[in-house]
Amino acid sequence: MISKVMRTLCTIGVVILTLTACGGPASAPEEQLRAWVAAGAEAAKDKNRRELVSMISESYADARGNERSDIDNLLRVYFLRQQKIALLTSIEDITIYDDTAAKIEMTVGMAGMNDSVLGLSADAYRFELELERDADEWQLISARWGELGEEMR
């Protein structure tokens, strides 16, 4: 039963990612940023922490006081607790500043199979990601997030 739910969530996620990419003609930086989000979602689904952390700038800092190493540790704990992960991403807005910086506003539904009583956990969060272009790569320099309906910080 749970496997069926996970397959359904993954299918919905692929559809949403595909539809997100079909928002009309996008600029080259916008296409790169959408690809960056898709790559991050795929790395999370595969529990590839190394790939995710490589997408974060060495100088990352956020309002919660986290640095890159703190985000790495958050990912480590989440990936250890979840046997399987499914993400549903919806990009609401991408703002690009001089092709060298960007802000992405998005909602992410997260589901994971784990050893809890129900065997499944699910949450939905809003994210504001700030990115900077370093050479040809986009790097996350800061982020704010919060559960849907709650204040982001």
Q: Where are these predicted regions, by residue range?
A:
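Short beta-strand edge/turn micro-motifs at domain boundaries
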Residues: 101-103, 121-153
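Hydrophobic alpha-helical core bundles mediating ligand binding, dimerization, or RNAP-core interactions
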Residues: 37, 56, 75, 108, ...
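Surface-exposed, charged secondary-structure patches
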Residues: 77-119
